[in-house]
């Protein structure tokens, strides 16, 4: 079999099914990545969302016996919102990161990979494949870097010459020995804009990420957000794009190649106050198609409360008092009390004190006391 010709056939076919870039890499172990992951583990930089077995993350042979190569794919996504609604006093809005715009990208990339699998099986009935997107064992970034999709930027994203870092990544391990592509040389140079602007200092020189400090991770946690990060969330409901929007390689990059990825402006830049009391059914109907809904509504509601505090949105005080008094979830009651302390206003202190009289949760009581402290500081 002429595997170079097969590779060219696969490249040509990929363009007909909506794959923006494709690359090929050997399936040899990722030894350099292994050392980096061990270091991240030792430094406690991992988020907990990753595959815990470092061997599986770095050795494709453990995932597919007889693995010879890996096919990496990239799909470009939009970076600019058309007809974005305005956020104004009385109608404050939050924002979902670009990776949550449109249909859940996991579904979109799996569709492309399944089509690619079917094409290869038709050509080679005895082929073995294993595909994955984002939540698989392998590092999408390491595979894409090896396959020549792009280089690994200081913002810990794959940066492509064609689309910047606004790309979704997926890969397919196979026992077919495709000729590999060459990696792309790092083009970040001496630029450190992403590192300098990161709101929490999560990006570290050398392309390392302290995941537990990253706002993209913090917005997905379900508990009380540490107070040191609350003011840094801004109006982010899910995820963070700061290290991408500041990147010079992303200047002018905005691609609308895939209808499934087109965002609904009202969904990705939603009014904050209605989020506080949205029902499970309405949440699922409205946001269920987005990747940003995967953790459920509670983290997004907590972040909406923090965004209202960020804006010091006085019109939201009655709604926040309602959450503090009546919401069954301690995280939302406590976060609302803290937010009320940040916003301030007539009657807020009395509302917090009244709620404290019937509150039994120790963490919520701590947040209520903190809210009162913040109010007292305003009077000093």
UniProtKB/Swiss-Prot annotation:
Entry annotated with the keyword Repeat: yes
Subunit structure: Monomer.
SMART domains, alphabetized: EZ_HEAT (SM00567)
Keywords: 4Fe-4S, Cytoplasm, Iron, Iron-sulfur, Metal-binding, Oxidoreductase, Queuosine biosynthesis, Repeat, tRNA processing
Broad EC category: oxidoreductase
Domain of life of the native organism: Bacteria
EC code(s) of this entry: 1.17.99.6
Residues annotated for [4Fe-4S] cluster 1 binding in this entry: 188, 191, 194, 247
Organism: Bacillus anthracis
Disulfide partners: none
One Pfam family here: Fer4_16
Subcellular location per the Swiss-Prot or TrEMBL entry: Cytoplasm
GO biological process, any: queuosine biosynthetic process
Cofactor requirements of the protein: cob(II)alamin; [4Fe-4S] cluster
Record note on cofactor: Binds 2 [4Fe-4S] clusters per monomer.
Catalyzed reaction equations: epoxyqueuosine(34) in tRNA + AH2 = queuosine(34) in tRNA + A + H2O
Function: Catalyzes the conversion of epoxyqueuosine (oQ) to queuosine (Q), which is a hypermodified base found in the wobble positions of tRNA(Asp), tRNA(Asn), tRNA(His) and tRNA(Tyr).
Metabolic or biological pathway: tRNA modification; tRNA-queuosine biosynthesis
A GO cellular-component term linked to this record: cytoplasm
InterPro entries the UniProt entry points to: 4Fe4S_Fe-S-bd (IPR017896), 4Fe4S_Fe_S_CS (IPR017900), ARM-like (IPR011989), ARM-type_fold (IPR016024), PBS_lyase_HEAT (IPR004155), QueG (IPR004453), QueG_DUF1730 (IPR013542)
GO MF annotations, alphabetized: 4 iron, 4 sulfur cluster binding; epoxyqueuosine reductase activity; metal ion binding
Active-site residues, Swiss-Prot/TrEMBL: 134 (proton donor)
Domain 4Fe-4S ferredoxin-type: 179-208, 226-258
Binding positions for [4Fe-4S] cluster 2 per the UniProt entry: 198, 214, 240, 243
Family the entry assigns: Belongs to the QueG family.
Name of protein: Epoxyqueuosine reductase
